[in-house]
């Protein structure tokens, strides 16, 4: 996982270093200060582990996690839409743009790579700057779940034709964890928990409750957002508990853009406490952006 990032130049991040906690990191700042960009670069610093491994007690775990959580291990070029004309994120700077130091003592430098695909002429990728002739290096293999602002699109405003039921689901034990956490936060008992793909941009909840007037189609945006965050936490718990051996300081990363969006301040604090608990118990390193004054 990430210990610190040192920037030479990338957009507005010039000659600046960021050090991170191994558990939970809150990124705050005014609008347009590259908070979300920082999340993108963190995700870009990892690769998805192999789907099958002799270290899994359940070889289905990563497939399930990737399917029910919309964005896993995204790369910069896949989640960022740049300006209409090409904009160099590090004009006048070549080679190393920034360096990531990982908790295991390893480090990687990163460079810009312009796409050679004419259909992606305005996009660039951020790739490791591997030294020539040195020892072979590669991105650390850890699952990263990225919860962007697309998760806030209200399911109640979605046409039925845009909803597709996801056939895979977490094991019953972990579905029960989601149900219990949701009840602890909101006092709502949910059952028959599954997931829906909403278009091609969001994985939303599908469930019933003990109140006939409330189900996954009628919940508020905040209740929807809470479910998605809780599902991501439990998914990474499932991954950790699927490992036969865990020798690393951290085993996964959770990234949340605008953590406080749609959530009442009191719920933000309670959810933050639960995130800290999960980060420590299940070896998750968490990063989220916020405009909250209370967090």
Language model features with spans:
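P-loop NTPase switch/coupling surface
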Residues: 1-157, 165-174
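Residue-level detector of functional hotspots within protein domains
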Residues: 4, 131-133, 205, 215, ...
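Short, charged low-complexity intrinsically disordered segments located at boundaries
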Residues: 72-81, 210-216, 256-267
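Glutamate identity and glutamate-enriched acidic tracts
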Residues: 77, 82, 91, 119-120, ...
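Extended helical coiled-coil dimerization/tether regions that scaffold
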Residues: 145-249
């Amino acid at each position: 996982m990430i210990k610190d990032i040192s920037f030479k130049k990338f957009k507005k991040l010039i000659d600046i270093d960021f050090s991170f906690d191994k558990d939970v990191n809150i990124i705050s700042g005014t609008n347009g200060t590259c908070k979300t960009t920082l999340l993108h670069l963190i995700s870009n610093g990892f690769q998805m582990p192999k789907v099958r491994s002799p270290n899994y007690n359940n070889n289905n775990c990563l497939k399930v996690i990737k399917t029910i959580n919309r964005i896993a291990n995204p790369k910069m070029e896949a989640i960022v839409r740049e300006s209409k004309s090409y904009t160099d994120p590090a004009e006048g700077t070549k080679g190393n743009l920034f360096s990531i130091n990982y908790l295991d003592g390893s480090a990687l430098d990163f460079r810009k790579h312009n796409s050679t695909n004419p259909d992606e002429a305005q996009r660039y990728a951020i790739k490791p700057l591997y030294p020539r002739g040195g020892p072979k290096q590669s991105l650390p293999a850890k699952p990263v779940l990225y919860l962007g602002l697309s998760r806030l699109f209200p399911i109640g405003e979605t046409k039925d034709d845009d909803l597709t039921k996801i056939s895979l689901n977490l094991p019953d034990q972990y579905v029960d964890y989601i149900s219990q956490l949701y009840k602890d936060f909101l006092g709502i008992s949910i059952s028959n928990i599954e997931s829906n793909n909403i278009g091609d941009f969001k994985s939303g909840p599908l469930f019933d409750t003990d109140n006939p007037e409330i189900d996954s189609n009628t919940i508020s945006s905040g209740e929807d957002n809470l479910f998605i965050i809780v599902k991501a936490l439990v998914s990474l718990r499932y991954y950790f508990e699927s490992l036969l051996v865990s020798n690393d300081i951290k085993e996964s990363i959770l990234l949340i853009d605008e953590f406080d969006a749609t959530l009442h301040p009191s719920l933000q604090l309670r959810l933050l406490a639960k995130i800290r608990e999960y980060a420590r118990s299940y070896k998750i390193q968490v990063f989220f952006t916020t405009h909250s004054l209370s967090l």
